[in-house]
Amino acid sequence: MVSVEELMGQVIDSEMEVISKELSKALEEALNLVKQKRDSVERTYTAKMQEMVTKAKEEIEGERARLDIEVKRAVLGEKNYWLNKVYEGTIKSLGTVKNSQGYKQGLESVLKRELRDGSIVYCSEDEVDQVQKMIKGLKAKAEVRSDPKIMGGVKIQYSDVGLVRDYSLNLILDQVFESLKPKIAEILFGEM
């Protein structure tokens, strides 16, 4: 027969085994619950961190784009400044061109070809006398007026048909300078 103590030992062992199994299950469930919560928190904060990193990248890219635009504007401003300096230098050297024999012959050729009686010829203030002499030499009847906006050359107005032909140095210089701007920029800045 089994003694009470042995019986108690068996019951205690059996209950301990049941309790141990239950505690193992409870521990496993608790660990799973902790793991799930940890994974959930990790996913949440990982998403938040990714969002913050993405936002920071976008801000950096936006700032980079803004700075690129500012740099391009500054460079363009400098380029335009120096191109304008070249243009101003060209305008200052027009006196040499206007005193040349080729210029005078070209001006006379334009007047010979385009002038009609009754026309009005506009020219720079310093060329009025010269243009009047040319018109007299051509034996044409035309009025000569000075135009302070004209640097050189002439504009011929045909009043009878309402037409003005522009042979001024202003127009020629603007057209030539505009077409040569890329070459001038290449010379000044090493660009095409």
Swiss-Prot record:
Lineage, broadest ranks: Archaea, Thermoproteota, Thermoprotei, Sulfolobales, Sulfolobaceae
Function as written in the Swiss-Prot or TrEMBL entry: Component of the A-type ATP synthase that produces ATP from ADP in the presence of a proton gradient across the membrane.
Gene Ontology BP term (one): proton motive force-driven plasma membrane ATP synthesis
Principal location class: membrane
Name of the protein described by the UniProt record: A-type ATP synthase subunit E
Quaternary assembly: Has multiple subunits with at least A(3), B(3), C, D, E, F, H, I and proteolipid K(x).
Keyword Ribosomal protein carried by entry: no
A Pfam family this chain is assigned to: vATP-synt_E
Similarity comment: Belongs to the V-ATPase E subunit family.
Organism: Metallosphaera sedula (strain ATCC 51363 / DSM 5348 / JCM 9185 / NBRC 15509 / TH2)
Location in the cell: Cell membrane
Recorded GO CC terms: plasma membrane; proton-transporting two-sector ATPase complex, catalytic domain
Gene Ontology molecular function: ATP binding; proton-transporting ATP synthase activity, rotational mechanism; proton-transporting ATPase activity, rotational mechanism
Keywords: ATP synthesis, Cell membrane, Hydrogen ion transport, Ion transport, Membrane, Transport
Annotated membrane topology: Peripheral membrane protein
Nucleus listed as a keyword: no
Source organism, top-level taxon: Archaea
